[in-house]
Amino acid sequence: MPVDAWIREEIEIPEGVEVSVQDYNVKVKGPKGEVEKKLFWPGVKIFVEDGKVVIYKDFPRRKDVAIVRTFKAHINNMIKGVTEGFTYKLKVVYSHFPITVKVQGDEVIIENFLGEKAPRRAKILPGVTVKVKGQEIIVEGIDKEATGQTAANIEQATRITKWDRRVFQDGIYIVEKAGKPITF
């Protein structure tokens, strides 16, 4: 099997975005804010050159190639986050007991889920905003991981176990990620 001498992936830095790399910390600044992430793998070099972010590895093995391309995807997501942002839409679904959802500090409070007296809580990660409009919840942020995890926390807070999901369909469900509808 032929072996490549190196792998080099390049990412164009769009106008209005500033990328800096220092001690494996990649910092991306843009019109919506700033995202920082530590990207380390032995032998992988990340640097900025001629308006591009370059990810480089000498004599890569299969795992090294996968890591380089993963780092490229992470940096692309960081650039997209500071320019466009990420949005998740969730829908509140209930059949009998009306669910009340409100944001309080860094938590989403879900009341009267299946008639329960105690409210359920979902954590909102730093840098993420949650808005409740009727039966729709909108989660927005510039960090894809934090935004997605917050949406997942809200969905998981209403997960039903030990009951037939075909009958008991109450809950909060992600219906749209980054402008693309989710099909069930």
Curated annotation (Swiss-Prot):
Annotated coiled-coil positions are none
GO MF: rRNA binding; structural constituent of ribosome
Where is it found, in Gene Ontology cellular component terms? cytosolic large ribosomal subunit
GO biological process terms, semicolon-separated = cytoplasmic translation
Under InterPro entries, the record lists: Ribosomal_uL6-like (IPR000702), Ribosomal_uL6-like_a/b-dom_sf (IPR036789), Ribosomal_uL6_a/b-dom (IPR020040), Ribosomal_uL6_arc (IPR019907), Ribosomal_uL6_CS2 (IPR002359)
Alphabetically sorted, this entry's keywords are: Ribonucleoprotein, Ribosomal protein, RNA-binding, rRNA-binding
User: Matching Pfam families, A to Z?
Assistant: Ribosomal_L6
Where do the TM regions start and end?
none
Subunit and interaction comment: Part of the 50S ribosomal subunit.
Family the UniProt entry places it in: Belongs to the universal ribosomal protein uL6 family.
NCBIfam families xref list: PRK05518.1, uL6_arch
Question: What is the purpose of this protein?
Answer: This protein binds to the 23S rRNA, and is important in its secondary structure. It is located near the subunit interface in the base of the L7/L12 stalk, and near the tRNA binding site of the peptidyltransferase center.
Stated name of the protein: Large ribosomal subunit protein uL6
Per the UniProt entry, what species is this protein from, by scientific name? Pyrococcus horikoshii (strain ATCC 700860 / DSM 12428 / JCM 9974 / NBRC 100139 / OT-3)
